[in-house]
């Protein structure tokens, strides 16, 4: 009996100590378990009411980026394009002075003209590549069909003319020399008209040139200087 009384007293003391540890503001253990078992709806509401960070939709972000990267396109009138094309035909890489001169003539800025020349060079390179690309796939056999067939004898060479025979010139006969009083033969007088006549010679024959004139030697014996 005494043991049972001691155990009851110990339980009462433990109950008093637990009561002193729990403050009056906290509910009892039974009520605490009941308040913990609540539905998740209040937590959703609290999360909805809580502070949210501003989030941008992907479409809105892309629109902002496109708007920041958007460039202003420059429209050229026919007169400006004609002047630019003429300058491009003269020089595809103009320097700063040429670009400034074009800027004054066309009324555009130097930066716009520089960008136009860059785009024009890229366009020309693209056109050249598009023209050369179909030719690269063709084989040499395909080109042979476009070439004309060579005949058996493509060229006929004329036969060489017969050798020309020289006829004696009408003035080539020897003229008699006349002795002079000075003891020496005088040089025979030749006609200045030794050239052939104006009539053309026979075909395939040319006159021979006249022989050189021979000077006659003196017939007198040499005189002694004694």
From Swiss-Prot:
DNA-binding region: 69-128
InterPro entries xrefs: HD, Homeobox_CS, Homeodomain-like_sf, PROP1
Record field: compositional bias (Basic residues): 64-74
Comp. bias intervals (Polar residues): 31-46
Residue stretches of biased makeup (Pro residues): 198-214
Chief location: nucleus
One GO CC annotation: nucleus
Function: Possibly involved in the ontogenesis of pituitary gonadotropes, as well as somatotropes, lactotropes and caudomedial thyrotropes.
Protein name according to UniProt: Homeobox protein prophet of Pit-1
Protein species of origin: Canis lupus familiaris (Dog)
């Amino acid at each position: 009996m005494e043991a049972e009384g001691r155990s009851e007293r110990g339980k009462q003391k433990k109950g008093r100590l637990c009561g002193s540890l729990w403050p009056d503001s906290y509910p009892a253990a039974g009520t605490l378990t009941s308040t913990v078992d609540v539905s998740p709806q209040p937590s959703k509401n609290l999360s909805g009411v809580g502070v949210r960070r501003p989030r941008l939709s992907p479409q809105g972000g892309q629109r902002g980026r496109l708007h920041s990267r958007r460039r202003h396109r420059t429209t050229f009138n026919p007169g400006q394009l004609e002047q630019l094309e003429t300058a491009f035909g003269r020089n595809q890489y103009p320097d700063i002075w040429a670009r400034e001169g074009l800027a004054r003539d066309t009324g555009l800025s130097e930066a716009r003209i520089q960008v136009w020349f860059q785009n024009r060079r890229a366009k020309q390179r693209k056109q050249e590549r598009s023209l050369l690309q179909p030719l690269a796939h063709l084989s040499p056999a395909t080109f042979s069909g476009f070439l004309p067939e060579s005949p058996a004898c493509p060229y006929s060479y004329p036969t060489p003319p017969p050798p020309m025979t020289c006829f004696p010139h009408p003035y080539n006969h020897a003229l008699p020399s006349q002795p002079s009083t000075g003891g020496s033969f005088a040089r025979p007088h030749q006609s200045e008209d030794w050239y052939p006549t104006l009539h053309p010679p026979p075909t395939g024959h040319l006159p021979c040139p006249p022989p050189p004139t021979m000077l006659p030697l003196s017939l007198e014996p040499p005189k002694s200087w004694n």
